[in-house]
Every structure is written in structure tokens, then in C-alpha cells.
Amino acid sequence: MKLLHRLYVLILVSIGKAVDIWSTKPYPANVLSNLYPNTFEIDGVQCASMEGFLQSLKFQDISKQREICALSGKEAKDSSTTVWQSTQTIYWQEYVIHRQSQAFITHIKRAYKAFYTQNKSFREALLSTRGKRLYHIGGVTDSYKTILTEVEFCSILTELRDGVS
């Protein structure tokens, strides 16, 4: 089934009906990737990429969060840990948030809203996808094993792009 989904998305991409977001794909897919060095600030913390921000949520130590927020690309992705998975607990500054909660989704949407508002390159790339479906076929689908699933990621971007937030 997953193979059929991939094939379907590849066909949509090839006929210009979709964008498969991936760091190694051509514009705008690469700029929309969480790994891309798009900077933004949230709650006074400078982030070198959305990936840095997302990976920082896995650490309770605030100084470690700031350190990881300053990373982008593979360096940010490689800072990951799976420790949070056993409790489904993530952290932002002094807050403790359950990964499967509405509070988590609200927090992530707030970060993407800040990102969209502050980063012109990201915003322009996202707006250039109007009328297309967004996919991230290499993304993980199990919310218990990833900080952000393919569906969550693409839904948030679609809401931002289409002004449904």
C-alpha cells in the first residue's frame, strides 16, 4: 500500500499537481523542508531551522534546547534522541507537553506560524505551491515514533498557505 501511495504522489508531482517536500528536491520542495536553513525566532529563542526547533523539543534542559535550535540540516537531525518516545513527553522552555495532546499540536502550529510570518523565503516557497497538494512521502507516519508525522506536517503547511489557522 505504501508503494502505491508513493507512486501516486510521484505521478501527481510529475504532472504538477503536488509537491513532495524533501531537502534534496528542487524548489520549492527543498526550501519547505524542515532541514533547510530558514531562520526564525520563537519565545526569544533563535532557530536556524524548523528541524532544530523540532529536535530541541526532545530535551528538557533549556540550554540544550537553545543549542539544538541553533542547528540546521543534517546536524539538527543528527541531534535527535528517542528517549522521549517511552513517555511521549516533550519540552519547551519550562513547559512539559504530552506528544499526543492538543497542546502539542497547538504549540507546533504556533511555531510554524512564527516561522511563516518571519521568514520570507519559506513564506514565498509555501505560497508558490498554491493549488497543489503537499506531501512528504519519506516522512514517518507513527506519531509515537516521530516528533511530527507526514500528515501533521503537510496539514500545518496547507493550513498556513491557505489561511486556515
Spans of features found by a protein language model:
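Charged, low-complexity intrinsically disordered segments
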Residues: 3-165
